[in-house]
Every structure is written in C-alpha cells, then in structure tokens.
Amino acid sequence: MSKSENLYSAARELIPGGVNSPVRAFTGVGGTPLFIEKADGAYLYDVDGKAYIDYVGSWGPMVLGHNHPAIRNAVIEAAERGLSFGAPTEMEVKMAQLVTELVPTMDMVRMVNSGTEATMSAIRLARGFTGRDKIIKFEGCYHGHADCLLVKAGSGALTLGQPNSPGVPADFAKHTLTCTYNDLASVRAAFEQYPQEIACIIVEPVAGNMNCVPPLPEFLPGLRALCDEFGALLIIDEVMTGFRVALAGAQDYYGVEPDLTCLGKIIGGGMPVGAFGGRRDVMDALAPTGPVYQAGTLSGNPIAMAAGFACLNEVAQPGVHETLDELTTRLAEGLLEAAEEAGIPLVVNHVGGMFGIFFTDAESVTCYQDVMACDVERFKRFFHMMLDEGVYLAPSAFEAGFMSVAHSMEDINNTIDAARRVFAKL
C-alpha cells in the first residue's frame, strides 16, 4: 500500500469519511485521496514523493501559488508577536482599508473566519435590514453550509425549498426560493409571487460549484434591476471570484453593483478568512451599532489578517490578472484542440483565473441542467488518467479549476500534452 492509502485507512477510523471536508475524499471520482506533504509554487508533493501540477489551489486561495514568500514571511512575523488577542489590532484597520479600496462597492467590511460565515451573516443582515424572511438562491450554486442555504429546488421554480441535507428543518428551508441560474424569468416569477417577502438574492457571479458557469450578459444586470424594483438587496458571493476574476471581483468585470459582497479564499492568502461588506446604511445595522447580531472569537485574527494583507498587496500588483487570463486562456484553448484531435466532445468555460471542463455534446454549458447532462463517468476516467500524468485537477465534475500566477507556460503546455495522451486513450 502507498503512504496515502495507509493514512486514508487510519483517517477513516478517526475522522468521518477520513477527511475534514467531503470533496477531499475523492467520492466524486473514486479511489484514494492524495495526502499532501508540501506544496510550492504551482506544485503539490504527496506523501509518496510524487509531484503534481496543481489546478485546485486549495480550492481557490492560492492565486499566487503555494508557499509565496511574502505571505509566509508575513505569517512568521505576525506569529512572533502573538497568535490571538481577542481585541482590535492595527492590522484589522489596515486590512479593512485595503479591501474597501480594492472593492469600491464595499463602504464598510466585517471580517469573519470562513466563506460560510460571510454568506450566513450577510443573509441575516439582509433580513434584518429589510424586515423580510425569504431569500432567492440558484440551483447549482453553493454558498457554504448554513442551514438556509442547504436547499434544493422543489418540483417547480416557485415551490418552497426543500432541505438537501438531513438535519436542516423544513421550516428553515421554506424561506429559501431556488431559481434557475441565467434565467431571469424564473427570478421575476418568484418576486411576483412573493413581492413583499423577499429580503435578498444571493448569487455566485460565476457559478463555481457546478464546475464553472459564467453569467449570460443580461443575467447579473437583470438581477440588480429586479432587486431595485422589488426592494430587495443583491448579495454577490465573491468567495471564489473575488480578486481572481478581476482585482475588484466579478462585480467589476461584469459591471454590476451589489448591496453586499461576500469574500473568502484569496482574502486570507491560505489562512481561514472570510468577509462581508457593502453599503454603509446596510452595514450600520450590524452589531454593535445596529440590532443585527454577528460575532466571532477569532474574527480578525492577527495571523490571518497579516496573511491576507500580504496576499492582497501582491494580487494588486500590475499584470497579475493579465497573466492569470493569459495562462487560463492558453490552457482552455489547448484542451479544446487536444480533445478535437481525439474526436472527444468537450466544452471548456473560463473566466479570469477560473476554468471548467465538461464532457458534453452540447455547444455550451450555461446552467445546472446543462452541467447535469455532461458525461461524469468520462470525467472520472479523465481525472485519474491525468493524475497518473502528474496533473492534479479538482476531484469532482462539479468543481471549478483554478490557475495561479506561479504556473508557467511550460506547466500549461505540459498539461495540454498530458491531456493529449489521455484523450487518445479515453
């Protein structure tokens, strides 16, 4: 047995499923998950000593690559002053100044410890600010594991939500309406059925949890207009897209202004950080200045703030996002060319430093139904064959891939060459 297999066997006796987050267990592709020893730049190294070109990037945070010296040094320097104080620090102020400068729609920001905390808190704030209970989310979009968000669509677009996890009371889920991504008609229908009850829409501006599905040109502006028409708030969940699709996020890339923004992943530089913020009048409703409660023992942790501050300063340097786009575009085009040579139908969506690979005969993939029609079994085989070639992709047909500026064009070309060999046998 390999070291990964031995560790996985031991882990399953001690940790549910052997992992601390389900997708890591390779349940979406089968087989034994890799146990990682270290990472540097664009590469992961497993406990058996094998190196992989990494397109998971810790599920998004590693936009600069692994073990970036500026972040590592910031963490070491901060740790030497203490690990946690439970009191305000100067770095929290500096971090808030930087975030609000980089994302102009955020007048104020509150730091939390995860993307789930950010979305959960933003929704509570939207409900408290509007005095309404219902929210709209989209089929195939993921916003963390808060109870009100673990909801699937019912039998029709306007049915009340049903829990998609045991442990979520139906009374919670009934306040969540699930509409179809990229379908404004379904959203208008929900508003017309509940015109005075919907507090907010929460949306991934690029859906990264049904692989990678960009918005149609009219979709995000249409959501903004509907929120304005019916007095609801628009929450853009940029946990995945923030500082990756563009420096000011997907909201800037697509030209739409939310009322609230949720951030995570890159904002922590690899440390557990989330944030939410937006309009001053809305944020003023948050405790201690307002009645909507939110708190956290480790929120604004000095080590995490130092890592995030260093990361964002590097991400804000000229050329970073142009490099991400160039590398991702080359990878997408190369994969499509290699698939076409092998006669394999393939769609590759990409925006900024995000991409998604779909085995499908369709010309495009624009919604959850399109994603579900793709050939998942072929993806599973592709994943494992690429892993054997030393390329680490997301171990699920429903997760986006992530580029970093640490990837070289040689890494990209080697990945395309590996895919060409795999497609020939697929």
UniProtKB/Swiss-Prot annotation:
It is an enzyme of class 5 (isomerase). GO terms for molecular function: glutamate-1-semialdehyde 2,1-aminomutase activity; pyridoxal phosphate binding; transaminase activity. Pathway: Porphyrin-containing compound metabolism; protoporphyrin-IX biosynthesis; 5-aminolevulinate from L-glutamyl-tRNA(Glu): step 2/2. Its main location: cytoplasm. Its cofactor is pyridoxal 5'-phosphate. Disulfide bonds: none annotated. The keyword Cytoplasm applies. Its EC number is 5.4.3.8. PANTHER family: GLUTAMATE-1-SEMIALDEHYDE 2,1-AMINOMUTASE, GLUTAMATE-1-SEMIALDEHYDE 2,1-AMINOMUTASE 1, CHLOROPLASTIC-RELATED. CDD domains: OAT_like (cd00610). PROSITE patterns: AA_TRANSFER_CLASS_3. The modification N6-(pyridoxal phosphate)lysine is found at K265. InterPro entries: 4pyrrol_synth_GluAld_NH2Trfase, Aminotrans_3, Aminotrans_3_PPA_site, PyrdxlP-dep_Trfase, PyrdxlP-dep_Trfase_major, PyrdxlP-dep_Trfase_small. Belongs to the class-III pyridoxal-phosphate-dependent aminotransferase family. HemL subfamily. This is Glutamate-1-semialdehyde 2,1-aminomutase. It catalyses: (S)-4-amino-5-oxopentanoate = 5-aminolevulinate. It is found in: Cytoplasm. GO terms for biological process: protoporphyrinogen IX biosynthetic process. GO terms for cellular component: cytoplasm. Keywords: Cytoplasm, Isomerase, Porphyrin biosynthesis, Pyridoxal phosphate. Homodimer.
